[in-house]
Each structure stands twice: as structure tokens, then as C-alpha cells.
Swiss-Prot record:
EC number(s) per entry: 2.7.7.6
Cofactor: Mg(2+); Zn(2+)
Role: DNA-dependent RNA polymerase (RNAP) catalyzes the transcription of DNA into RNA using the four ribonucleoside triphosphates as substrates. Forms the clamp head domain.
Sites where the protein binds Mg(2+): D464, D466, D468
Organism: Thermoplasma acidophilum (strain ATCC 25905 / DSM 1728 / JCM 9062 / NBRC 15155 / AMRC-C165)
Protein known as: DNA-directed RNA polymerase subunit Rpo1N
Keywords: Cytoplasm, DNA-binding, DNA-directed RNA polymerase, Magnesium, Metal-binding, Nucleotidyltransferase, Transcription, Transferase, Zinc
Domain of life (superkingdom): Archaea
Reaction(s) the record says it catalyses: RNA(n) + a ribonucleoside 5'-triphosphate = RNA(n+1) + diphosphate
Annotated NCBIfam families: PRK08566.1 (NF006336), RNA_pol_rpoA1 (TIGR02390)
Top enzyme class: transferase
Subunit structure: Part of the RNA polymerase complex.
Molecular function, one GO term: zinc ion binding
Annotated disulfide bonds: none
Length: 885
């Protein structure tokens, strides 16, 4: 039979009868031992050769196959006494409740049976909806369970009580119903009555849920391992089966020898415990079976269920070959489409190339190089690791056999060559929460031990460089490589399907640098310009202006060199949002309204609104008008220009950024004192009972709302005072105003005051009895006692302020952790619910049986990445373009 493949037409789930278990079995296991003194499997033991082989050199006694040929075969154990299958306890109770203890019939009258039989016979038990079947059968079972007298034989019935996990008894007695008695009761149920329980008697008789024969899984399901000491260590399942066989033998001997009933019952309970924990070692109500070391055994249910179980861990998702994982590092001079791969990884990862008449000479040259070739300068050169013959045999290439195998290869062979520059690979960072968590990059072989990529690609991956690791997958098929280049390449993912705007763009230093380069259009000498432009292509040169006989270059002209010809765009910069001036193009003293005409920057300041992810107007326009390739080229040039410029110019921030004069500190302290007076007056008014409640609120809520409002006002006002002394010459302010990092609120907390700390939108009120900390009087509801921090980070927080600040900060951490787990679970449920949906050729959304879900994908059939941020058209885009000038 080996080697014969058959197509599976259908799968039917059923219970195994004792006879089927015996027929399926190749050996009756009667001894608990595994190997003899010579290390050879014992006959009729748990490692009997009839159940398969795991040792090289041995052959299976059933099919004659070796280790890699034998699929494994079942054995069986004849149990001394019946035991309840823990997985069917609910069903057993259902049968005991709804059937007569004497005659075994379902406790429905003949009239009810005649009425309900046509209804249940209409149901298709094999292909019907399980929920509909369950609702119908539950109706019959509930009706039958309520009867305390059998309508067929007149026998008085008792209510059945289940003492979990597997003990049954009749109500009012402590005498348990033994598994043997349960089995006898279930055997009396006629086949014709089983339809009312949703059971098919041909595939599932109820007495089969009480075990008399236990199947023993094949050896390759529970292989033993050899430890470093040379001792064998058996699998957890084998340990449990040993316990079951030993207790079953003791129970059989005690029963046959006429031992007292108490001893027999104890051994029977012990056998039930071992069989229960063999199936599920986390059954509530009984202690888990443990290894000698104290570790809980991993039995059948634990191997199947959960994230680490067989289905989710080994079938839905697997570990794969041709992949690599290491720490990531930034490399500002790589293209967004590129990934820097360490030489060590490039030598290990291979791409299969099928030899044909067009590439055979090239492949021979590659093979002749061997495994570790280098050029005359000692740089990496692609080698070959393996060649594969047409019959599937792999030949490892070494420096000794390289020339011989180069001559031997022919058309139809496969050459597994190492990575070379330009190969397309998939790059991924987990958690993979959206499409852009896995994108196609082209390879650049670099020295070092880390993967490197352009910082502009951090946003879609949500990556930073504090120790993050990423995965790289080398594509093995030509069709997949073509797909990756055309669909998955980074430049094709610039626009996010979530909001229809760019998700790849300049971050942090890029934004700061371009802000400094363009704000107020600074002037540079020829030498300075050469330094700034050094990292760009040599043919990109800005337009020079002659002033007093000298060549000068302006920041906007330098930035214009990286813009494509024909680009026309107008927008307000991020600087505008924090400006006190009007941001209109006709009246713009703050230099905040950007205008680009025919690829030349006329006016404005480049900042977050121009080149950053989520808001980059220039990237958005270039992608829509010139395509993905031009957008990627702009981002490459923009990041090189920004890093080159800021490296040359220099940019430093420090604690001195937040120095404000003593007069400003005094003004802030005065503001805080005034606010405290107002809060104290509010509290006095409240205590006198004169505070008027706000509509829909209690007096207490009104007081809290008023105090929070006062605390918010003083923080905002102190922030304004601090900010008025911190202008656009201050590096930290440049970062905040340009959108590179942080906000002016963060800066005001450092230089002004930190302000009111809150938990769940209100002031702090928990802690000790009637006070937040023992440092305050009981009943104190003043500002300081309820989490108002009057210090700034510059001056430093007092111990109580630091404690309150930590409480406020911890809420953010806990909230983040809770939201992460909830959103992760929600996403998993959505994925499972939608996994059978597909978009067909007519853009209709259907499930696997062809049911229509949506007439048009997304109701409108529009790709969000091609929409104008979710709208059909962008009027500004249409109006302000070539026709403008």
C-alpha cells in the first residue's frame, strides 16, 4: 500500500466502537514496559514494533517500512473495568436524564414520538446546520428529562446528579452509579430513540462513550528521546499509558482474586483518574498528573487546543525555511525599497535557479566559485550552496567538489545560489497588524550582523531601533518573485489603505533638517551647498544667485532640486497650526504657506505637513501624479538631503533649551497661587452648601469639574508664558513646531508646570482612608492633596508630586496593555470570521458557497489607496495644477 495516493472525497466524524478500536489496532498492549535490557522494543509493550518505528535501522513489524516510510499504527489496551470518557460527560448525563433507568426508552409518550418524529426526520444530520439540530434535540431532551415516571414501563425515575468531572449519582443518595452500570443503562437505549438525541446509531452508540477498550497512539505520535547521558526519556503520553496499564492490571488481579469491594472501587477510581488525565490533564475538579520533577504532563487535549496547540501552532502557522531573523539598525543612505542583509545571512539563504539552455554557462561559473567566494578587494561575491539533481538528490558544494559539479550540471538541474544584490525578499516585523507589516525589498549585502533599512520605512513596520528584531523571507518561486516586485514592493505601499494618505515619509531628523533648510529661506555659499548636496546624485545642482560677485544658494532652491518637474501644490505647513499670525498665502509673515509651482518651491516652510507619514502633502501629490516609482525616488532623495544637511549643519538639544528668566518663573508661581486661591474659594463655597450644581450633575461632580477647569487654565497659561520665552531659535521648539517630535505641551511641562494628574478623567481620590496619601489631612480635597503638580520637570517634583505623577503615568501603561490584548483578540475573531470571503472577477464579495455578502467590494468598489483620503475626488488637486500658471 505504500506510495499509493488517494483523493479524500469527504470526512465524517464518528465515535469509535470497541470493535472498531480492536480492528484498527495492530497489537494488544499488555505490558507497561517499553525496552528490554538491550534497548530493543518489548513485544506487546508500549513501544512494540507493530505500532511503528522511530529508530534508524529498524523496520515496522506491520508495514515493513523504515523510520521515514512507516506512518505509524495503533495498538489497544483492554481495560479491566469500564471508565467514563471525560470528553462525553455532558452527553452521558443527557442520556441518563432523558431515558428510563429500567427499560432504556426515551421518556416521551407514544403520541409525542409520533408528533415529533417527522419533524426530526426532516433534519439532515450530516450537512445541516449544527445549531438548528441542537435547538431541536434540546427541546425533546428537556421535555423527556422533566418526567419522573416512564410513560412506557411506568418505572419511577430519579434525577441524576453529576459530581464533576466524571462521577454520577441519583439525587438524594450518596451511592454513585458506576461506569459499568452507566454502560448497561446506555446499552438498553433502542436505536430508534437515538434520533431524538441527534445521534446516528450506525456511527455513534451512547455506550461507546464509556470506554472498555483504549486506543494506543502510534509510536511516532509519542517518540522517546535519548538524553545526553544516554538514558531514554519517554513522552508524556507514554508515561500516562504506563500508569493506565499498571492500574488496569492491578484492578483485574484484585477483581479476579476476590479482593474487598473497597479496594476494587479505589483502584477503579484511580483507573478513571488516569484515563481522564490521559485525555485532558487540566480537567477541573481533579489534580493534574505530574512528572517526577513536578511538571504537569502535556496530554491529548493540551496538545491540540490553544495558541501553542497542534492546530494554531503547527497547522495554521508553521516555522519556515529560507528565512532569517536578526536585530534591525538604521541606514539613511539605503533606498526605501532596499534592505541591508548581513553577509553571514546572505551566505546561508539560497535562491533556487532551474538550469536551462540560456543560463547554464552562468550557473557553471557560479558553482566554480564555491561557497565563500570574494573579489580581489575582499568583498562579497555570490556562491552556491547546493545543486539538486532531477531525481531530487541534493549535492552539497564545497571548495573541493565545486569544479567537478560545475561540469556535471545539465538542463533540468536546480542550483541553490546564495543571495545577490537586487534579489527580491520579503521583510516583516511582528506583530503583523496590517498589510504593510510585510513588504518586498531588494537586497543589498552589507558588513555587520544586523538588517538595515531606511528610516522612512519605520512607520508602516512600527519599528524602532531599541532592540527590535525583524524577519526576512527569501522567495523561492519565480511567480512569487514577480508578484513581490509588482505588488509588494515598498514603493507600492506608500499609500495606506486605512486612510488613503502616505504612510511612508520623513521622520524626526528628516523633518527638522528640511525645516531648518527652508524656513525663512536661508542662504548658503558654494562650499556649504556642496557639503549639503554631497549625498545626492551629482547632476542635481540648485540654481545659483549672484550677489556682490559671489555665488549663493538658497534653502528652497536646494530643496527644489529633489522635486519632479511639473509638480504643483499648495498647502498650509504644520508651523501654521502653532502660529499666532494668519496663514494665508497673500498675508504670510510666518512663512507657513507652502507653494510649489512646476517643481520649484516658491514660498513656505517644509515640515511635517509636507513630507511626513499620514500628512505628507508633497509625497501624496507626487504619488498620485507621477506614480509610485517617482514617489519612492523623492523619499530617497529627501532622506539623503535631510541627513546630509543636518549632519553638516549640526543640531543639538539639551537641558539649557528650557531655561526661562526668573521673572517668567515668578509670573508662573503667581498664576499657580491665584489658581490655588480660586480652588480654595470653590471648596469653601461647596462646604457652606452654596455651590450651585451644573445641569445634570451633582454638587460634588460640579466642584470636581470646576477645580479641573481651573487646573487646566493655569497649566495652559503657564505654558504660554514659558513658550513666549522659547522661540524658534530653541532646538526643542523647532522639533515641536515642525512636527518632528513632541509637542509644545511637553515643552511647557518641562519649563512651566506639569499640572493636574488625572485618573479616568478625574482628579486622584483613591489611596488611604479619606485621603490620597498619609502626608495630607483626612478630608482634604485641595489642589495639592488631589494630584496637582505645581513643579516643572526643570525644577524637579516633590516626593508627593512624583507619587501622583506616577499614578497618572501608570494609567496610560495599563490602558495600553489592556487595549493591546483586546484589539488583538478582536482582530483574530474578525480574521476567522472573514477568512472564507473572497472578491470575485465582478468585484462582488462572496463566501465559499457563493452567498453574496457585498454587491461591490467595500460597498463602493474603490481602492482606498487610490481615493482622495476616502473621498472620490480632491477638488484642490484638480483646480490647482498645470492650469494654474
Amino acid at each position: 500500500m505504500m506510495g499509493i495516493s488517494k483523493r479524500i472525497s469527504s470526512i465524517k466524524f464518528a465515535l469509535l466502537s470497541p470493535d472498531e478500536i480492536r480492528k484498527l489496532s495492530q497489537v494488544k498492549v499488555i505490558t507497561a514496559d517499553t525496552y528490554d535490557d538491550d534497548g530493543y522494543p518489548i513485544e506487546h509493550g508500549l513501544m512494540d514494533l507493530h505500532m511503528g518505528v522511530i529508530e534508524p535501522g529498524l523496520r515496522c513489524a506491520t508495514c515493513g517500512g523504515k523510520v521515514d516510510e512507516c506512518p505509524g499504527h495503533f495498538g489497544h489496551i483492554e481495560l479491566a473495568m469500564p471508565v467514563v470518557h471525560v470528553g462525553f460527560v455532558k452527553e452521558i448525563k443527557m442520556f441518563l436524564d432523558a431515558t428510563c433507568r429500567s427499560c432504556g426508552r426515551i421518556k416521551l409518550t407514544d403520541d409525542e414520538i409520533r408528533t415529533y418524529l417527522p419533524e426530526i426526520q426532516k433534519m439532515d444530520f450530516e450537512t445541516g446546520d449544527p445549531e438548528d439540530i441542537e435547538i431541536l434535540t434540546k427541546k425533546y431532551v428537556d421535555l423527556a428529562s422533566q418526567r419522573m415516571v416512564c410513560p412506557h414501563c411506568g418505572a419511577q425515575q430519579s434525577k441524576i446528579i453529576l459530581d464533576k468531572p466524571t462521577t454520577f449519582r441519583e439525587e438524594g443518595t450518596n451511592v454513585k452509579i458506576t461506569p459499568k452500570e452507566i454502560r448497561e443503562r446506555l446499552e438498553r437505549i433502542p436505536d430508534d430513540d437515538l434520533i431524538f438525541f441527534g445521534f446516528n446509531p450506525k456511527t455513534a452508540r451512547p455506550e461507546w462513550m464509556v470506554l472498555t477498550v483504549l486506543p494506543v497512539p502510534p509510536i511516532n505520535v509519542r517518540p522517546s528521546i535519548t538524553l545526553e547521558t544516554g538514558e531514554r526519556s519517554e513522552d508524556d503520553l507514554t508515561h500516562k499509558l504506563v500508569d493506565i496499564i499498571r492500574i488496569s492490571q492491578r484492578l483485574r488481579e484484585s477483581r479476579d482474586n476476590g479482593s474487598p469491594q473497597l479496594i476494587i472501587e479505589d483502584l477503579w477510581d484511580l483507573l478513571q483518574f488516569h484515563v481522564t488525565t490521559y485525555f485532558d490533564n487540566q480537567t477541573p475538579g481533579i489534580p493534574p498528573a505530574r512528572h517526577r520533577s513536578g511538571r504537569a504532563l502535556k496530554t491529548l487535549v493540551q496538545r491540540l487546543k490553544g495558541k501553542e496547540g497542534r492546530f494554531r501552532s503547527n497547522l495554521s502557522g508553521k516555522r519556515v525555511s529560507f528565512s532569517s531573523r536578526t536585530v534591525i539598525s538604521p541606514e539613511p543612505y539605503l533606498s526605501v525599497n532596499e534592505v541591508g542583509v548581513p553577509e553571514r545571512a546572505a551566505r546561508e539563504l539560497t535562491v533556487p535557479v532551474i538550469v536551462n539552455q540560456f543560463n547554464i554557462d552562468e550557473m557553471r561559473e557560479l558553482i566554480k566559485r564555491g561557497r565563500n567566494p570574494r573579489d580581489q578587494f575582499g568583498r562579497y561575491v555570490t556562491g552556491v550552496n547546493y545543486v539538486i539533481r532531477p531525481d531530487g538528490r541534493r549535492i552539497k558544494i564545497t571548495d573541493q567538489n565545486a569544479a567537478e559539479n560545475a561540469d556535471r550540471i545539465d538542463i533540468g538541474w536546480t542550483v541553490e545560489r546564495q543571495l545577490m544584490e537586487g534579489d527580491i525578499v520579503l521583510f516583516n516585523r511582528q506583530p503583523s497588524l496590517h498589510r504593510m507589516s510585510m513588504m518586498g525589498h531588494t537586497v543589498r549585502i552589507l558588513p555587520g550582523q544586523t538588517f538595515r533599512f531606511n528610516l522612512a520605512v519605520c512607520t508602516p513596520y512600527n519599528a524602532d531601533f531599541d532592540g527590535d528584531e525583524m524577519n526576512l523571507h527569501v522567495i523561492q518561486k519565480e511567480e512569487a518573485r514577480a508578484e513581490a516586485r509588482i505588488i509588494m514592493k515598498v514603493q507600492e505601499q506608500i499609500m495606506s489603505p486605512r486612510f488613503g494618505g502616505p504612510i511612508i515619509g520623513g521622520i524626526h531628523d528628516h523633518v527638522t533638517a528640511l525645516f531648518l533648510l527652508t524656513h525663512n529661506n536661508p542662504r548658503y555659499t558654494h562650499e556649504e551647498m556642496v557639503h549639503i548636496m554631497a549625498y545626492l546624485e551629482p547632476d542635481l545642482l540648485p540654481e545659483a544667485r549672484i550677489e556682490n560677485g559671489e555665488k549663493y544658494y538658497y534653502g528652497r532652491d536646494i530643496f527644489s532640486t529633489i522635486l519632479p518637474k511639473g509638480l504643483n501644490v499648495r498647502f498650509r505647513s504644520k508651523l501654521c497650526s502653532g502660529s499666532s499670525e494668519r496663514c494665508e498665502f497673500e498675508d504670510d509673515p510666518s512663512d507657513t504657506y507652502v507653494e510649489i509651482v512646476d517643481g520649484k518651491m516658491i514660498h513656505g516652510t517644509i515640515d511635517e505637513a509636507a513630507v511626513s507619514p499620514f500628512s505628507g502633502a508633497i509625497i501624496d501629490k507626487i504619488f498620485r501624479k507621477f506614480g509610485s516609482q517617482e514617489a519612492a525616488r523623492f523619499i530617497d532623495r529627501m532622506t539623503r538631503l535631510a541627513v546630509g544637511f543636518i549632519t553638516y549643519r549640526g543640531f543639538s538639544t539639551g537641558i539649557s533649551d528650557y531655561d526661562i528668566p526668573e521673572s517668567a518663573v515668578a509670573r508662573i508661581e503667581e498664576l499657580v497661587a491665584q489658581a490655588e486661591d480660586r480652588i480654595n474659594k470653590l471648596i469653601e463655597t461647596f462646604r457652606r452648601g452654596e455651590l450651585q450644581p451644573a445641569p445634570g450633575r451633582s454638587v460634588e461632580d460640579t466642584l470636581e469639574m470646576e477645580i479641573l477647569s481651573e487646573a487646566g487654565v493655569v497649566r495652559d497659561e503657564s505654558g504660554k508664558i514659558a513658550s513666549s520665552y522659547l522661540g524658534l531659535k530653541v532646538p526643542s521648539v523647532i522639533m515641536a513646531r515642525s512636527g518632528a517630535r513632541a509637542t509644545m505641551l511637553n515643552i511647557s511641562e518641562v519649563a512651566g508646570i506639569v499640572g493636574q494628574q488625572s485618573v479616568r478623567g478625574g482628579r486622584l481620590n483613591r489611596g488611604y482612608y479619606n485621603r490620597t496619601l498619609p502626608h495630607f489631612k483626612r478630608g482634604d480635597i485641595g489642589a495639592d492633596a488631589r494630584g496637582f503638580v505645581r513643579s516643572s520637570y526643570m525644577t524637579g517634583l516633590s516626593p508627593t508630586e512624583y507619587f501622583f505623577h506616577s499614578i497618572g503615568g501608570r494609567e496610560g501603561l495599563v490602558d495600553t496593555a489592556v487595549r493591546t490584548s483586546r484589539s488583538g483578540y478582536m482582530q483574530r475573531r474578525l480574521i476567522n470570521a472573514f477568512e472564507d470571503l473572497k472578491v470575485d472577477d465582478s468585484r462582488e464579495v462572496k463566501d465559499t458557497v457563493g452567498s453574496l455578502i457585498q454587491i461591490r467590494y467595500g460597498e463602493d468598489g474603490i481602492d482606498p489607496t487610490r481615493s482622495a483620503r476616502g473621498k472620490a475626488v480632491d477638488m484642490n488637486y484638480i483646480l490647482f495644477d498645470e492650469e494654474r500658471r
